[in-house]
Amino acid sequence: MKFDKIYTAKRIAEWLQAELIGDPNQEFKGMNEIHKVEAGDIMFVDVPKYFKKAFQSAATGIIVNEAVEPPSGKCVFVVSDPFRAYETLGARFYRFEALN
């Protein structure tokens, strides 16, 4: 899913009320799941055993629940509930309507 424009890591961290580890000026253009991420995308991972796979993915930003040092060129957003933060970010850009 692509954002309506490019946003900085600092701005996204503010929206998520996350601790940011990495470059606050890093730019993001969208979000997606681990198998579909591209450079400039954000994903989440909430199980530490998958952190390595997330860091090896094309994602530029990863929402996690532990403060870890990201590889060069990536940012980490630390929150208590990564899935909820990912949902919050998605809801900011994509309005979901219930089917009746």
Question: Each PLM stretch: what is its role?
Answer:
Residues 1-100:
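Terminal amphipathic alpha-helical/low-complexity segments used for targeting or macromolecular assembly
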